Regions:
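C-terminal segment of N-terminal export signals and the immediately downstream linker at the start
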Residues: 1, 18-57
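N-terminal secretory signal peptides and thylakoid transit peptides that target proteins
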Residues: 1-14
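Glycine-rich, histidine-containing beta strand-loop boundary motifs that form or position
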Residues: 10, 68, 123-124, 145-149, ...
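Surface-exposed loop and adjacent secondary-structure segments within mature catalytic domains
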Residues: 153-183, 222, 226-230
Length: 346
């Protein structure tokens, strides 16, 4: 038993179990508790066999993948062309978002000792999430969930874990009149968002196409599901509250592999917990429905337009704003990182 196991066991063992039996028995109890919560790793004999992983791949329609960090190229040859390409890509948040081995916190969270998840299920539908949750539970694997990859605690990825990567689950549906399942509330405008959508996609759909506003975050590459579950303070929070306050309903897969609907009437405790309790804490969210608001008449716009390898005369601010708003949302091939942040006009 090492010091880590003793500390974990101490935290997980009720205080009453430490009273009476003496230090030897208490230490053994702590060790047992630590072993109970220890996840299976590749070096353990209980690690799933190749046949087991193949079955999971079949259950998810071929969406299981082994996760390999592109930073491995820098460990082999720090000055080689492959490593230079990786560093060039790391300047672009879209490059990071499209690789399950990277997160938006890679630069300052164990960057040079990157240990991504062992495998990832690139989920396309709720059934893929159910299969991954059941597989992780049955095999005692650590499970992580990655949407936008902005977890500042590094929980978007973990070594020797199974990742549920929701990037492809980004359908967005606008509702003129939405009523949560089983509720008697009057209908209201809303938007249903897949767990893998980022705010840039949502703002484009809701504001540009729908003429409405949805309370979200100021950074366009942040994932919707993670921000809402973390509370979600944004540009208009003084007017509309947090992103979590706009949540009307969520579909979530809990640890028992059951798909549940959470709203004010159905599973209200779970609904309460999802609004700020932390991403992936109570299950894996597959979609969310958020309240939308009337689009404000006046906006204050802050524009970040970073370009790599681009030279020439910088145009005046007004032309830069007009040109940026006319361009497509993402131009990763040009090394461009652009963010629009809107706030109350004052």
């Amino acid at each position: 038993m090492n010091r880590r196991e003793l500390l974990i066991g101490a935290a997980l063992t009720p205080m009453a179990r430490w009273i009476g039996p003496g230090p030897v028995a208490a230490a053994q109890s702590a060790s047992n508790s630590a072993q109970m919560f220890r996840r299976t790793r590749p070096s353990d004999p209980q690690w799933p066999s190749a046949a087991s992983w193949n079955r999971l791949n079949e259950q998810t329609d071929g969406h299981l993948m082994a996760v390999k960090s592109p930073l491995a190229a820098c460990q082999d040859s720090p000055s080689g062309p492959a490593c230079r390409d990786v560093f060039k890509g790391l300047k672009n948040p879209y490059y990071i978002g499209d690789d399950p081995a990277l997160t938006q916190t890679t630069g300052y969270l164990d960057a040079w000792a990157s240990q991504p998840s062992a495998y990832a299920v690139a989920a396309r539908k709720t059934g893929d999430v159910v299969a991954a949750v059941n597989f992780a539970r049955d095999n005692n694997l650590r499970l992580v969930v990655r949407g936008g990859g902005h977890s500042y605690l590094g929980t978007s990825s973990a070594p020797d874990s199974l990742m549920i990567w929701t990037r492809a689950m980004r359908d967005i549906t606008l509702h003129d009149s939405f009523i949560p399942q089983g509720c008697l509330d009057p209908p209201q405008p809303a938007v249903t968002i897949g767990a893998g959508a980022i705010w840039m996609h949502v703002y484009n759909e809701v504001m540009t196409r729908g003429g409405r506003y949805v309370q979200g975050g100021g950074c366009g590459t942040v994932g919707v599901a993670g921000l809402v579950q973390g509370g979600g303070f944004g540009s208009y929070s003084k007017n509309y509250g947090t992103a979590a306050a706009s949540l009307l309903e969520a579909e979530i897969v809990t640890a028992d592999g059951v798909v549940r609907i959470a709203n004010a009437r159905s599973n209200p405790d779970l609904f309460w917990a999802l609004r700020g309790g932390g991403g992936g804490t109570f299950g894996v969210v597959t979609r969310m429905t958020l309240r939308t608001h009337a689009l404000p008449e006046h906006l204050r716009l802050r524009l970040h337009d970073h370009q790599s390898g681009v030279s020439g005369v910088i145009p005046p601010p007004r032309e830069r704003i007009r040109g940026s708003l006319r361009r497509p949302p993402a131009q990763p091939s040009l090394g461009r990182d652009r963010q629009h942040q809107a706030g109350p006009y004052a």
